[in-house]
Amino acid sequence: MLFFHAMGVTGASSEPIARYLQDRYFCILPTSTVYCEGQKYVSKLDEIRQVEDFLHRQGVERLAMVGASSIGADLAMAFLTQTKLPVEHAFFDGGQFAQIGKGTRRIMTPFLYFAIKSLYWSKGGTLKKILWCDDDSIKSYFIDAGKNLTYTNLRRQISDSLEDKPFPPLSKELQKHTYFEFGSIEDHFKYRQAVMEAYPCGHYPVFEGYNHMQYQIRDPKGFAEMLAHIVERDCMPELPFIRK
């Protein structure tokens, strides 16, 4: 299983989930070069190349699942359309499928930079100002990411992410095994209709009353079991909070 993380955190943010999957699956949790000390973000294609090179060196021949959270959806979608590895399933948790103009993204960058850096400077104290929760269990991932973040790397990432252009094509076959999940009260829910129109053969579960990435943050074991169920049975499990 390959996981693409959200904005402002490191790949380790998927470790609470991976702990419940590691006995069954080889879990790969790369951190974007944006949040790596001394590394230079070049482009989405370069990020994908680095991931592909690692998978090749490890002898990975197929992926049971590609998982992506928030803005990780942007990189995951690029990976899915570029990789030559067979991908059996994909799951997007609150995917930030925003299509934002170049000028707006340029304006956003300094605000995002100071928001993420403030998490490092305040040791996570400002988390509640930018996220619906400030659980201690997730603060360290934001602090570690903020420590290594440079303005130049963030600017480069935002320059080729969330672009105002059509979503990349996914084969109908992969769409049939792809799950685009949103919480009913999260801000990213507004992207759902556009994604449904772009990928009509996908699955679109709604977690009623849930906020952005709430299930994986508050119940990583349940989230992990859900992913395993999808891989092993090719369908969502019966969860009491899924909108009927």
For each feature predicted by the language model, list its residue ranges:
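Conserved serine/cysteine hydrolase catalytic core
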Residues: 159-197, 216
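Catalytic histidine-centered segment of alpha/beta-hydrolase-like enzymes
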Residues: 210-223
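Flexible "cap/lid" loop of the alpha/beta hydrolase fold
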Residues: 81-118
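Active-site loop/oxyanion-hole signature of alpha/beta-hydrolase fold enzymes
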Residues: 28-65
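Conserved alpha/beta-hydrolase catalytic His-Asp/Glu region
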Residues: 102-103, 119-172
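Conserved HGGG/HGGXW glycine-rich cap/lid loop of the alpha/beta-hydrolase fold
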Residues: 1-37
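Gly/Ala-rich beta-loop-alpha elbow adjacent to hydrolase catalytic centers
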Residues: 67-76
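Catalytic histidine neighborhood in serine/cysteine hydrolases
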Residues: 199-213
